[in-house]
Amino acid sequence: MDVNPTLLFLKVPAQNAISTTFPYTGDPPYSHGTGTGYTMDTVNRTHQYSEKGKWTTNTETGAPQLNPIDGPLPEDNEPSGYAQTDCVLEAMAFLEESHPGIFENSCLETMEVVQQTRVDKLTQGRQTYDWTLNRNQPAATALANTIEVFRSNDLTANESGRLIDFLKDVMESMDKEEMEITTHFQRKRRVRDNMTKKMITQRTIGKKKQRLNKRSYLIRALTLNTMTKDAERGKLKRRAIATPGMQIRGFVYFVETLARSICEKLEQSGLPVGGNEKKAKLANVVRKMMTNSQDTELSFTITGDNTKWNENQNPRMFLAMITYITRNQPEWFRNVLSIAPIMFSNKMARLGKGYMFESKSMKLRTQIPAEMLASIDLKYFNESTRKKIEKIRPLLIDGTASLSPGMMMGMFNMLSTVLGVSILNLGQKRYTKTTYWWDGLQSSDDFALIVNAPNHEGIQAGVDRFYRTCKLVGINMSKKKSYINRTGTFEFTSFFYRYGFVANFSMELPSFGVSGINESADMSIGVTVIKNNMINNDLGPATAQMALQLFIKDYRYTYRCHRGDTQIQTRRSFELKRLWEQTRSKAGLLVSDGGPNLYNIRNLHIPEVCLKWELMDEEYQGRLCNPLNPFISHKEIESVNNAVVMPAHGPAKSMEYDAFATTHSWIPKRNRSILNTSQRGILEDEQMYQKCCNLFEKFFPSSSYRRPVGISSMVEAMVSRARIDARIDFESGRIKKEEFAEIMKICSTIEELRRQK
């Protein structure tokens, strides 16, 4: 059927149609190949913005470093990173004056966190640069490798499991003359396969010891690995993002904890809250400005955009901010917090995989690793790449580029927000001392600025003053990309405000559909997404009902579980038809077993198993939810699980859904091809780690291994817990005498083995 799209909008207010203009349907673009070019762009741009700074050489690593701090004030509108220390400090002082005690209180909160955080905090997070293997690894593995290397180099502060003690090890490791590490390498050899008599390549994985001198170790400790940011919509060019190693992560975590604590107390900060809470916070600021602009005042809002926020920020500035914020605090605390910015002032950017060359005529492909870019003849490269390499060459050391100015993406979101808010804070009349004044919102690099003044000239003067004040601290408002409107219409972090926030529904589109975890989770996530959008995003009842029908259809096609009485033939239809015919109460069958859909928009909050439980045949119930059924993989399932859903912008967010352990909540097995690669050893370590943690959780159901278990080891803790539990069970008659004796015997054997070890 043909629909004239303009008809759809006849009854819709213009602001509600905004979401149709967003590039959020279909698959987002992914990057292919290496990120080396993007990383070189970042490094070169960052240096260009600070080019009038002073050059120095790092005495430890020999890396050339550019310091733009207190550099020349800009004379044009080009972006620049010449922040003035005294201006930043003054902005901090005024921020504290308007919020008495804010820094003091946040420091106290952070100090508590610093003393309590366990080192396993660092296992959260995705890919992490593993300096021992010089490539990315899952965070838990990278941490385990780091601790293992520290141990073998006589650094043992972190045995107690506090993050702060691990950081002491990091500091000590940097003073060592050399560090011995274990690296993995592959041996390939051609052997004849006994079965097929063909020649095959066999890979074996070896471990070898390697010594790093102080300089090499420092370079690795200060390295950020770079990748291309994937799935960015609405952009033509990709860009590089960084992942730091374990040495930097802990320090960054504490700085961000402090900054987060400050942001929570600032009404202009869009972080760390999100969703409806954020909307309420923003609406408050707007309301304040609109009520205060009496009939005599004009009020305008700028939907702001900053040019290259990260690349013009400077870690040295962050150091100045932290020094000021913590000025009355104990020495140890100030030291811990100042290390992150110091490390970032000396950071190195790893250039990634390098370039791939192929010769069409000779059908040859060859990889030029980043390490070779310093010496290779440039005639092989095209014009633009040649320029990049020439520019970056003076900065290269061992395949990494020295990058002192600038912050890589997403490292200090909270702290940079504090800096932005401190400028918004200066808009109060008592600081501007004229007829105009401003306020606004800041969330990392995104901002909205509301300016009030008696006339248009005043508005213009206010905007100019804000623009110039920002320049003093290295923030560059883009005049091309920011636009101004009467207050009441603006956009901030993809929230559109028009006398209240308009639901931008298109942003949620990517999270509709079947997630592909397993039949049980997918059903639950699918209906939860629809429910959440009815609550938060103006998804009306009719549209929700339609979304539900489309979802069920999509779900049935994905898992080939069409109703038992359908004519559609799939791989599963034979089994499902048989089940349908054998079942007395057909309404009790789950959708994934070919049953009917009983969901409507009123009962989306009920898990499907509960919805149909009373309708199920008894033997079906018994098969579906029997813990002894070998097909039910029971991870200890709490009543609530977390799924990762992909909204259209921003990071993947975690969404809670009700989880039910049935025969449908299977966990797919790991792809076997990994077992033949160099990752195999890592995989085994990871599984071992996983098994130990799972075992430990069985003994301590509250999974209290996040808290210190005192000085005893995990094994001792489990043995003593087993003894206590066994005694209680024996005395209450839950277990027999023989079982009790057997448990005690096993415990003694374990202790004996530990002694012998």
Swiss-Prot record:
Record key words, sorted: Eukaryotic host gene expression shutoff by virus, Eukaryotic host transcription shutoff by virus, Host cytoplasm, Host gene expression shutoff by virus, Host nucleus, Host-virus interaction, Inhibition of host RNA polymerase II by virus, Nucleotide-binding, Nucleotidyltransferase, Phosphoprotein, RNA-directed RNA polymerase, Transferase, Viral RNA replication, Viral transcription
InterPro entries associated with the record: RNA-dir_pol_NSvirus, RNA_pol_PB1_influenza
Comp. bias (Polar residues): 55-64
Post-translational modification: Phosphorylated by host PRKCA.
An MF annotation (GO) of this entry: RNA binding
EC number: 2.7.7.48
Main location: host cell
EC main group: transferase
Annotated stretches, region: Promoter-binding site: 249-256
Disordered, as annotated region: 50-82
Designated name of the protein: RNA-directed RNA polymerase catalytic subunit
Organism, as annotated: Influenza A virus (strain A/Duck/Germany/1949 H10N7)
Gene: PB1
